[in-house]
Swiss-Prot record:
GO biological process: DNA-templated transcription
Protein name listed in UniProt: DNA-directed RNA polymerase subunit omega
Enzyme Commission number(s): 2.7.7.6
SMART domains per UniProt: RNA_pol_Rpb6
Signal peptide start and end residues: none
Gene3D superfamilies for this protein: 3.90.940.10
Function: Promotes RNA polymerase assembly. Latches the N- and C-terminal regions of the beta' subunit thereby facilitating its interaction with the beta and alpha subunits.
UniProt xrefs under InterPro entries: DNA-dir_RNA_pol_omega (IPR003716), Pol_omega/Rpo6/RPB6 (IPR006110), RPB6/omega-like_sf (IPR036161)
Name of the encoding gene: rpoZ
Length: 72
C-alpha cells in the first residue's frame, strides 16, 4: 500500500502522537466525543467522526499528553 496517497499520512500523524498505539487511542477517544455530540474543531467535507478526529490531530486542534517512557 502506498501511504503517500493518504492525507494526512500515518507517518505524519505518528510524528505528532509518538506511535501508532497513541494515535489509535487519541483519535478513537476524540471520535467517540464527536459521536456523543461535541462539535468538530475542523471544517472538512467528511461527516465521519474518525476522519474528523484524524484531521483534528493533524491540524493540532486537540491537546493530549504523550506518556512518559518507563515506570519509576
Amino acid at each position: 500500500m502506498n501511504n503517500s496517497m493518504i492525507s494526512p499520512s500515518v507517518v505524519d500523524l505518528k510524528a505528532k502522537t509518538g506511535d501508532r498505539y497513541s494515535l489509535v487511542v487519541i483519535t478513537s477517544k476524540r471520535a467517540r466525543q464527536i459521536i456523543a455530540g461535541e462539535e468538530p474543531l475542523v471544517d472538512i467535507e467528511s461527516n465521519k467522526a474518525l476522519t474528523i478526529a484524524i484531521n483534528e490531530v493533524d491540524q493540532d486542534k486537540i491537546k493530549f499528553d504523550l506518556p512518559i517512557e518507563g515506570i519509576n
